Structure formats: structure tokens, C-alpha cells
Swiss-Prot record:
HAMAP family: UPF0145. This is UPF0145 protein TK1926. InterPro entries: UPF0145_dom_sf, UPF0145_YbjQ-like. The lineage of its organism: Archaea, Methanobacteriati, Methanobacteriota, Thermococci, Thermococcales. Pfam families: YbjQ_1. Belongs to the UPF0145 family.
Length: 113
């Protein structure tokens, strides 16, 4: 189980050892991220040669982490201490611009006895 900004975050419907006592709603966080022109140039060169475009891989990893962080902060605002069923969605907004969106169900959980 991962903790982000003090919020438990899981992709499953439940958290082992905890029970859901209240559902607070949908927690969400998103970011639109563009690459730096220098990264774009390197990406074009790698694309010609073939293989992984590390510049974009790094950009998307950073965007996922930030979307997850923003989702956790939204869950806190809702009064939750956990988010279950976490999912990610991505879309291209433009050339070298991507949106990453994290969402899940904000809940209050208590440790089982």
C-alpha cells in the first residue's frame, strides 16, 4: 500500500486490515504537462533511431506522480484518509503536451480489530 500526502492510495476496492466506514466521493487530480524544447529535439532524434523515448517516459512518470499527489490532496479536502480503486487516464492535448488524470473513491477507513 502506498501513502501519498498522508492518504492511503490503492488500486483495489478494499485495503487489507481496514474497513471502509464512510464514502466521501470521487477524488481527482490532473495535470497537463508539456515537454521542454530540448527534450523534444532529443525525442525526435531517438524516434529516428528507434527505441524508447526516455524524455517522454520521464515526463509521463513525473505527470503521473503529480496527478496522484493532487488526487490525494483533493481526498484530504473531502475529509478522507484513503482512496480506493485508483485509476489513471491520459490524453494528448497537443503536440508534446499530455494530460494525466488520477481518480478514485475517497473513503474513511478504520483499522479492523
Amino acid at each position: 500500500m502506498e501513502t501519498v500526502e498522508g492518504i492511503m492510495v490503492v488500486t483495489t476496492e478494499t485495503i487489507p486490515g481496514y474497513r471502509i466506514v464512510e464514502v466521501k466521493g470521487i477524488a481527482r487530480g490532473g495535470i497537463v504537462k508539456a515537454t521542454h524544447i530540448g527534450r523534444d529535439i532529443m525525442a525526435v532524434l531517438r524516434n529516428i533511431k528507434g527505441g524508447e523515448v526516455r524524455e517522454y517516459t520521464q515526463m509521463m512518470a513525473e505527470a503521473r506522480e503529480e496527478a496522484l499527489r493532487r488526487m490525494a490532496l483533493h481526498a484530504k479536502e473531502l475529509g478522507a484518509n484513503a482512496v480506493v480503486n485508483v485509476r489513471f487516464a491520459t490524453s494528448n492535448v497537443g503536440s508534446s503536451v499530455a494530460e494525466v488524470y488520477a481518480y478514485g473513491t475517497a473513503v474513511v477507513v478504520e483499522k479492523e480489530e
